[in-house]
Amino acid sequence: MSKVTVIDHPLIQHKLTLIRDKNTGSKDFRALVREISMLMGYEVTRDLSLEEIEIETPVCTTKAKTLTGRKLGIVPILRAGLGMVDGILELIPAAKVGHVGLYRDPETLEPVEYYVKLPTDVHERELIVLDPMLATGGSANAAIQFIKDRGATNIKLVCLVSCPQGIAAVQEAHPDVDIYVAAIDETLDDHAYIVPGLGDAGDRLFGTK
């Protein structure tokens, strides 16, 4: 079973309150999502491998640690996941960025892929999938499966707000994918919105309805 980490740092929780507020406009919403994503990135990357090397400081020769192991990749789920990219890139600017675009078939209600662009060496990278909301888990599960189908084997899912139903759905479909969230809300309403949630993250990021 995958691990679920709730990142409850005080700064994250404060900023999360601000994006939940219906009176927060798109400009501030975008800035806050970027800031929360960056803060979450510290925990998401906590297990990156290090190796010891020898360097010259202005004073002497010393041993120091540097990143090693797998290269990193960021994969936002379009469109709302785009709002989280810049915050993560501020921490890991060398990461490559892929994209997964999905829409829901009006007849079957199943997610359908309309765009996937990933690094060619995706099988060699640790991928961080970004989506602000983990509601039913349908979009996240589909995106993760599309990524796996192209060779990825090391994937983490990062969301701002989640609910028990979405977490359970991802854990059942992808028990090898660890999940990082800033909050686990109560439930879903009849329209599959997270309650209390923050509304439609994509609309609030981009000022659409």
From Swiss-Prot:
Keywords: Allosteric enzyme, Glycosyltransferase, GTP-binding, Magnesium, Nucleotide-binding, Transferase. The keyword Transferase applies. This is Uracil phosphoribosyltransferase. InterPro entries: PRibTrfase_dom, PRTase-like, Upp_B, UPRTase/APRTase, Ura_phspho_trans. The gene is upp. Allosterically activated by GTP. It comes from the Bacteria. GO terms for molecular function: GTP binding; magnesium ion binding; uracil phosphoribosyltransferase activity. Uracil binds at residues 194, 199-201. It is an enzyme of class 2 (transferase). It comes from Alkaliphilus oremlandii (strain OhILAs). HAMAP family: Upp_B. Pathway: Pyrimidine metabolism; UMP biosynthesis via salvage pathway; UMP from uracil: step 1/1. Binds 1 Mg(2+) ion per subunit. The magnesium is bound as Mg-PRPP.
